[in-house]
């Protein structure tokens, strides 16, 4: 898509979000982690608080083709349900323990779990409820992404600029 097409898509999506929810969207997430320089430029133009378009270990400011962008990227750190579902090594009864193990193995990190309303909210609702319950029992703290972004941006100079790779 051209820059103009990406811009038109985001403007339309943000207008619909505003119509439905009554307030402006302050973030975006590219489907399938398909982010590029055009989407990053449009995010910067929209002055988004943050985006969550990638996989990674820690928040950063993306750089693509040598150009740095200003919208904070908070990457997903955990696999999505659909990435585990149907794989023989992850039958449903092992998924919750797998997530807990990933979080415990790197407990110092703030983990980001990307969910899909059509999976975790519908088809796998029971499994998602089990995960939430187990996280509660284990003392996992849930925080809002916008609060996390604001906390990070309070010390903007400490956030690294990193190349965004596919």
Task: Label each PLM-derived region with a short phrase.
Residues 73-91:
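Positively charged, amphipathic and often flexible ligand-engagement surfaces
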Residues 83-85, 112-117:
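Short, local alpha-helical segments
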Residues 1-27, 32-72, 93-113, 120-166:
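Catalytic alpha-helical scaffold of carbohydrate-active enzymes acting on polysaccharides/glycoconjugates
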């Amino acid at each position: 898509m051209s820059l103009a097409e990406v811009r038109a898509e985001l403007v339309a999506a943000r207008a619909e979000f505003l119509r439905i929810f009554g307030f402006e969207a302050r973030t975006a997430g590219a489907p399938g982690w398909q982010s590029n320089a055009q989407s990053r430029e449009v995010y910067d133009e929209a002055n988004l608080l943050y985006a969550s378009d990638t996989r990674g270990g820690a928040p950063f400011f993306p750089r693509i083709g040598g150009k740095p962008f200003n919208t904070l990227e908070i990457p997903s750190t955990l696999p999505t349900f659909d990435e585990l579902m149907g794989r023989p090594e992850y039958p449903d009864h092992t998924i919750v323990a797998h997530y807990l193990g990933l979080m415990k193995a790197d407990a110092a990190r703030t983990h980001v779990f990307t969910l899909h309303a059509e999976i975790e909210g519908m088809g796998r609702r029971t499994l998602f409820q089990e995960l939430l319950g187990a996280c509660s029992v284990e003392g996992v703290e849930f925080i809002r992404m916008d609060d996390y972004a604001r906390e990070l941006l309070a010390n903007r100079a400490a956030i690294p600029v990193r190349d965004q790779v596919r």
